[in-house]
C-alpha cells in the first residue's frame, strides 16, 4: 500500500513529467526536532520547478554521506538503518549535522517481483581519523551533490 503523501506527490509530479526521468528520485528525508521525528516525502526536481498547494520546494544539502544500498522488504528498513549506524561507527565515521534520507531506486515502489524495495540509506557523516580508514570502508562514503526537492510532509510521524 502506497502512503497518501507519496500518492499526493505523484499526482502533482505526473502531469509535469517529473516521475520517470533518470534524474527524478523519490526520497524520504528525516528531520529530528529534539525527540520528535518527522519525515518529508520528496522527489528530486530541476531547479526551475516550483511547488504549489501542499507541495513545497526545498534543498537537500550536499556533503559527505555514508550510503548503504539495500534490496529489502519495507519491514526490514529499521534494521537496515541500525546496521548503517553500526557500520559508520565501525569505519571511523560519526553522524554529523544534516538530514538522513532514503533514496528509492524504483518508482513506482510496488513493481518488485518479491515485494522488496531497492533503497539507498544515506547518513551525513564526518571522518574521525582518516588514517584509520580501511580501503573497503571508503566505498560506503560518497560526496553527494545538493539536490532540489519538491516535498510533502508525511502524516503520523
Segment roles from a protein language model:
Residues 127-157:
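Binding-site signature for planar aromatic cofactors or substrates
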Amino acid at each position: 500500500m502506497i502512503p497518501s503523501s507519496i500518492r499526493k506527490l505523484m499526482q502533482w509530479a505526473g502531469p509535469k513529467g517529473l516521475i520517470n526521468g533518470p534524474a527524478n528520485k523519490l526520497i524520504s528525508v528525516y528531520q529530528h526536532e529534539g525527540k520528535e521525528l518527522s519525515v518529508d516525502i520528496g522527489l528530486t526536481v530541476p531547479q526551475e520547478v516550483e511547488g504549489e498547494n501542499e507541495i513545497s520546494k526545498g534543498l537537500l544539502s550536499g556533503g559527505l554521506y555514508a550510503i548503504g544500498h539495500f534490496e529489502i522488504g519495507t519491514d526490514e528498513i529499521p534494521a537496515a538503518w541500525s546496521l548503517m549506524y553500526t557500520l559508520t561507527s565501525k569505519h571511523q565515521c560519526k553522524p554529523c549535522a544534516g538530514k538522513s534520507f532514503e533514496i528509492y531506486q524504483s518508482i513506482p515502489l510496488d513493481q518488485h517481483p518479491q515485494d522488496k524495495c531497492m533503497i539507498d540509506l544515506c547518513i551525513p557523516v564526518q571522518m574521525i581519523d582518516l588514517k584509520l580508514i580501511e580501503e573497503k570502508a571508503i566505498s560506503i562514503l560518497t560526496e553527494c551533490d545538493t539536490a532540489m526537492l519538491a516535498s510533502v510532509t508525511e502524516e503520523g510521524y
